[in-house]
Amino acid sequence: MAPRLVLASQSPRRRELLGQLGLALDVRPADTDERVLPGEPPRDYVLRVAREKARAVPGEVVLAADTAVVLGGEVLGKPRDAEDARRMLRALSGTRHEVLTGVCVRRNASALGVELDAVVATEVAFARLGDAEIDWYVGTGEPLDKAGAYAIQGSGGAFVQEVRGSVSNVVGLPLAETAALLRRAGFPLPWEQP
């Protein structure tokens, strides 16, 4: 029998996405500092945070991820408050931006262990938003705990005009790439088990 996968995240979206793969999960959120370091490139940032989360949580097989919206080289994490969400949405309005997710799988099955990771990028084109749309959306509360202040799988999806790449990446976890990392780490996926 395969070990249960430990998800080092409190994100309900990641839990739901992994549920789509039929994986049994133990959820153990990692307590890590998610601030961007001065001069840290966005790809390095999401990978560093994902690795730190995976290393902070015990378990035989641990999966961690970190997602950021990137506009003009600036990492847009979760907004601090409603005004910060408005600022982010104004900045994203009418632009193309990138959503990056760093994914790390750590397996402690041997003395050496295995750590595999990847960064997945998805390009998103956002509609032009007026103040009324932004105020309404912020008023729903939905953007307040989302990287970049929007949820493609929620009401924020109405503002997305085009997606190039993994849609599940924009939600918070690139499923195809995550399944490939788990497989490479020797973690059997449900359809591979006898």
From Swiss-Prot:
Its cofactor is a divalent metal cation. It holds the Pfam family Maf. This is dTTP/UTP pyrophosphatase. It is found in: Cytoplasm. PANTHER family: BIFUNCTIONAL DTTP/UTP PYROPHOSPHATASE/METHYLTRANSFERASE PROTEIN-RELATED, BIFUNCTIONAL DTTP_UTP PYROPHOSPHATASE_METHYLTRANSFERASE PROTEIN-RELATED. Nucleoside triphosphate pyrophosphatase that hydrolyzes dTTP and UTP. May have a dual role in cell division arrest and in preventing the incorporation of modified nucleotides into cellular nucleic acids. HAMAP family: Maf (MF_00528). GO terms for molecular function: dTTP diphosphatase activity; UTP diphosphatase activity. It is an enzyme of class 3 (hydrolase). It catalyses: dTTP + H2O = dTMP + diphosphate + H(+); UTP + H2O = UMP + diphosphate + H(+). The active site is at 66 (proton acceptor). One of its GO terms (biological process) is nucleotide metabolic process. Keywords: Cytoplasm, Hydrolase, Nucleotide metabolism.
